[in-house]
Structures are given as structure tokens and as C-alpha cells.
Amino acid sequence: NTRSGETPKFNDPMLNKQWHYKNTGDETLVSPIKEGCDINVEPAWEFCTGDPSIIVAVMDEGVMYKHEDLAANMWVNQAELNGQKGVDDDGNGYVDDVYGYNFAKDQGDITWTDPEDSGHGTHVAGTISAVNNNGIGVCGIAGGSGNNDGVKIMSIQIFAGRYQSTISRNVDAIYYATSMGASILQCSWGLMSGAINSDEQYLDERSIEANAFAHFINTKRPGSPLNGGIIIFAAGNEAGACGYPAAYPSVVCVTSLSTDFTPSVFTNYGMPADIAAPGGDLYYHKNHSDAGQVLSTVLKLDGMYAYMSGTSMSCPHVSGVAALGLSYAKQLGKTFEPDEFRDMVLASVNDLDPYLTGVKKHNNGTMNLVEYKGKMGSGMIDAYKMLMAVRGTPAITVEQDKPTTISLSKYYGDVTALSCTLEVSDAVKDKLGLTFTVEGNNATIT
């Protein structure tokens, strides 16, 4: 694993406040904080920054498609953009669906100006694909390099102020996203913890939704490097069991981390959790500092950029890394099956268990961190490891100055007939003092 130098790759002025991308442990930004508690995206950007053929459907409030830092990376239905107002120009059953569709109001116009709109969907979208290297605002994980090469955001609006789509409309939304080419369904929404307590109850009460998920996951899209789709959900914010649909096995359930590898005060957790990502932690940091939250795009009334926290904010980090992974796969000419790609996402992590000891004190009480061990998912998402997995080169983090044993089967599967070659120049080997031995399924570096 590598970490980049001090010079930012892009010129976006707020990138240095996005600790969730690169955390230097700067206590003048926020405290407590630990270096390295981030998604390690800067070294990943050396290989790939996005691809406009990759579409992420943001199922949420409407995305402000006119936002200065999002407009260039919005998905556009060209047939409707260049067609006649009030006419279903592309014959897909939806009129004027230029940037997606408003399923909350059953109309083509995406909205964000209802009195109760919060900018939630716009914030989520910015984490995934705010335009990079454009000299303004923030960066998106797969927002490109400033050359119209970021992944595209499709707005699948299911909330509009006091309006909310029904389950049947949610199902329509998922089928729409599938048919219009989205490979990733980003879902920072769900039922409260405890509203549904088992997969059986979920299927009994919301089987049409589960069937729509299966359709999204298993339907091939022409030209996509993923022979299907991946669905990514926020675990929820009640500090309890993961809510549904996030807890349903076919989707990816994302928990939230603070700035120091500890679980966010609010995050849901438990065995259904699949993976963790930065989501911020307002009530953990001194003086309730906003800087310990996630910085992204918001509505114009809120100043275009703002901090938010929640599993709603951790979830798009995983969607963004998945989008970056698919972009790199497209660049390399590789294709993956849905289960294969999901496994790669969940394996592209850094271990959290070493940080889950003792207690965490916050403004509202104390957390016993041991209770979270093994219940936050496979680990903290790492963008660099994701791209190395796509390339076929597993990235493994080891500690300096101590022997490290690596289980090859964890990274390569059945290793009974594996031929392992280590290529290190004599100069590097001598400088680092490396030795490398293989015994059975284990490789040992000293």
C-alpha cells in the first residue's frame, strides 16, 4: 500500500478539508483525528479518476443538476434534452426525464426547492462525482481529472420535501435505473432500525422491492465492465441494528467511521454490516466542529458546499470507490460478474479491529468499542486497494519492523497449485532488508 506526497493532485480549493479522502492527522482541522483514517484515494487517482460511461443512480432527494461542481458530471438523456417538451421522446414510458426522473412527484422535472428539501441527494452526489480539477469547490471520488472524464450521476428522486415515493414507485425507480444504464444504485435511505427484524419479514412485507433489487443486480448492460449491477445502502443512524433494506443480503450495507478509525456515535452495526467508510461524527469532536463531518456539495441556499454526517455520507464513499473501480476496469478492458465485483469491493479494506478496544467518550455518553468488533463490516474501504484488485494485483498493508505472515488464500482463493513470483531488485531488497519465504498457503515477509 502507498500514500501520496504532500502536493495535491487536483486544484479544487476545498480538497484539503476533505479528510475522508486524505487524512494527515492535522489536529488544527479537528480533534480527535488519526493519520490514515481515509479512503486512500489519492494514490488511486494516479491510475484512474473516473469514466463517463459509468453511471451511478443516486436514489435520494433530487440532485441539483445545475450545481457548479456537479453539472459537468450529470447523466443526460440526450433524446429528451433535444426532444419536445411534454413528449416521451425516447419511448421509455417517462416524459422529460432529462437528468433522471422524479418518482416522488411522478414527473420528469428533478426538484430541490421544496421547503423541506435538505440538499441530502446533492451532498451524496458530490462525494461520488463532484468535478475534479476545475479550480472550484470539492473533489468527487470518481469525478474525473477536469477533462469531462468523471462518472455520471443519474438523479432517481424518491423524496421531494414532504413528498415521498411509495414502495411500488421505488420499484419503478429501480427498473428505470436498470433500463437507462446505471451500474451502481446508491441508496442513503431505509427503514428505522428494528422496523423489520429478519430477511423473512422483509421478503414478506417488501418482496417486490427485493425482486427489483435482483433485477438490477442480474441484468446485463451493454458495454458495461460489470455484467449486472451493485446496490449500496446506508446502515442507518440509530446506534442499533442495521436497518432494512441495508440488512438484506443481496445489497452492500455500509457503516460509518469518525476521523480516528472509531465507529461514529450514531452508526448502526451488527452482522449484516458489510463494509465501513468515513461518515463523520459531529458530537464526538471538540466544540461540535463541522470539520469532523464530510464536506461535499449542497444547495445554493446553503452556500453550495457544506458538512454533513451520517451513514448517508459513508455510503457514497463506497459507491464512489466502486464507480472508480468500474472506471478502471473499463480502462483495462476487463469485465466482472456482480458477485465477483462485490467480493472485490468488500475485500478492498483496511482492518478496523485493532482500533476497537477500550471506550470512546463523546458529548452524549460513552461507547464500549469492543461491542463493535466484527460488526462494522469487513473493514474500511480503500480506493487504492480496489484498483489493485481490479488490475489483479492485491494490495496488502504490512507493518514496518516486524515479521508479517500473509494468507495467500485470502487474496487468491485456492492456492494449492499457485505459482508465486516475487520481483524485487537487489538494490531495493538490500535497502529495505527484505526476505520472502513461502510455506504452504502462507507467504512470510521479514
Model-derived regions: residue spans:
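Protease zymogen maturation seam
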Residues: 1-55, 63-69, 73, 102, ...
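Substrate-binding/access-modulating region of protease and related hydrolase catalytic domains
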Residues: 39, 46, 50-52, 61, ...
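Flexible, small-residue-rich helix->loop connector segments that border functional cores
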Residues: 44, 59-66, 79-92, 114-118, ...
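Short Gly/aromatic-enriched secondary-structure transition segments
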Residues: 69-79, 398
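Active-site-adjacent substrate-recognition loops and nearby beta-strands
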Residues: 110, 115, 138, 166-170, ...
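Hydrolase catalytic cores
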Residues: 125-128, 154-159, 183, 187, ...
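Surface-exposed or secretory-pathway low-complexity segments enriched in glycine-proline
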Residues: 399-406, 413-442
